[in-house]
């Protein structure tokens, strides 16, 4: 037996079994551990190249059309038809820009970055995450509140592209065709319309830093994120074909809109000329100059040419969110309990109770999940270890298990 082992050699590098850590035996061949590791790296690189080529070889006829994109969004997000239409068209045109051939006519289709304005809990982030499910390009979500100017505590602007590179498995060509969603863009508005003598490191300074990304330029990106340092190897990324979608709540911007329209937001008598204005939903009248009044610099606004808004969710919309989408809250909890062999059901009056509380405390759609989580916590803790295999969650159960103080502390 020892003699046979001495005669076994790696079919790739020729090393004998006695000089390697591990020898894997096939039908008519052997491979040592070192060659197996190298082969694994080759396979990974080949698969990544294939994935990149598959993306680069997108065909016009294979592209999802705007109506198809919106239908997909409809299956996950309730309402917000206007925002869905804008987003669907922008994503479709982004694909077409990627497929654009060099023409002799010199016409180059410019990208149309988007900014979405809407109250907290109306679905801005959910729209972005949902559309990522059907994309064939890398997609990254970034929180603008963590960004600061270079040299200050926080994340550099370039860290946005680090996230995109990570989503693309560090395939630069793929990342350069990706989509970036910047959430809470309103939090980097400058603190006032007038320049301040104090440094606004997380406001106007960050906006200035974002300009080079939005307008399209080659940016040196630290591969692992964090602060740049002289010895770190940078990855150059061309942002000309990266689509940026920005979103924010812009709390208080309704007053800016009302001032421009010379009307009041709500609660007062308006002049005859303003009777046609819907003062309970002023966001539908938002214009770029309102963003400037709020604190976005004109250069940023100019590079976000598509402006759309999200409607406040009414009671019916919140009620539908509980049950209608593919990943509705109730469906998620039914699945969670089913994994423990427990059948859970929610009564209509319980769902109405949850919606009423979300409206009462102005929690929006995001608050629905928090309320249900609080109500279901005791059952999720005890039932997996118990013998009871059914649970009917009605209004009485919800009232008994909802701790409002804990809920509001979490918001």
Curated annotation (Swiss-Prot):
Keywords: ATP-binding, Chaperone, Metal-binding, Nucleotide-binding, Zinc. It comes from Porphyromonas gingivalis (strain ATCC BAA-308 / W83). Component of the ClpX-ClpP complex. Forms a hexameric ring that, in the presence of ATP, binds to fourteen ClpP subunits assembled into a disk-like structure with a central cavity, resembling the structure of eukaryotic proteasomes. ATP-dependent specificity component of the Clp protease. It directs the protease to specific substrates. Can perform chaperone functions in the absence of ClpP. ATP binds at residues 119-126. It comes from the Bacteria. NCBIfam families: clpX (TIGR00382), PRK05342.1 (NF003745). This is ATP-dependent Clp protease ATP-binding subunit ClpX. The lineage of its organism: Bacteria, Pseudomonadati, Bacteroidota, Bacteroidia, Bacteroidales.
